[in-house]
């Protein structure tokens, strides 16, 4: 019995990485800002989103992992082959634009978190940009993945910060399983924030990166059970962390009437007199780790996706000469994101942070629908195509996000 379990554990550890990393990098600077804003402005009333979002995240991520294992191809590669180059090109342009705003947001997070420790952005941003570039360009897949796995574990700091904030556990748990009542449903910004929460939790770029990572790792169909567990564990852990971020800000900033915040670093600073130095340090350190982690992954994900979609060579195990477009795009996104943060005043950068998460939410249904069309093709997936239950959850997620987006846009029109 023990021998059988030991083999299963070793197999899980062997494939651990893509699902766990992808889900956890989801809690990036923009995500932390969105969750912090949700807690600071609306208390516990957005916690109800966590359970359905976790289920949807597991379903969507699992579909990507399964397609990667069965087909041996990345998502953008499959989209190009099945839907043509024109659609792929348009989708890649949209993804690069959205991901650029996401990369800017990560460097905002780096600047804000280190500013709390009196380090100017003119030192922190260039240094960290060079660090993440060197780590990926001069590393290889195995060493890079190990670094990312360690960074994923550091997110536990937010769980400790949530506990130190001394929330009302009864109210928080009740709000998680019960829909809010009253005027929040008529609040335009409540709907806007809810879409941001969905967009930051199930971001479009995650699906492309996960499938590419699965393919590059070379996971076989017979080992897929362990890979699926990797996705489930990663998705559950990332949303537990998100839950504690909302709770920490609700128990401190919302309770004391501080309301909206501009940057995620503001949440850490405001938390200091309310929850103590330890909560402040954990929140600030967690923000720095999340921002640095995502500043590495997001440009990497974009480079993978575009190269696959347009037929260029890609992969961190290839050198600059073998995959020039891959490395140039990765470099330009890092340099462009860092330069934007250095060039613009902080007051203008907040627009990038919030907009990036909403753009994620708007683009998400398009990506999920393309995934569903692919994964339900018997000639492509064989016996591994979607089950009816998986289709219901995935289509439901798309329709709900589309509906929320339409309501938000209608509410923002003059006279509404």
List where the protein language model places each region:
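Transmembrane alpha-helical segments of multi-pass small-molecule transport proteins
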Residues: 92-93, 116-137, 158, 325-339, ...
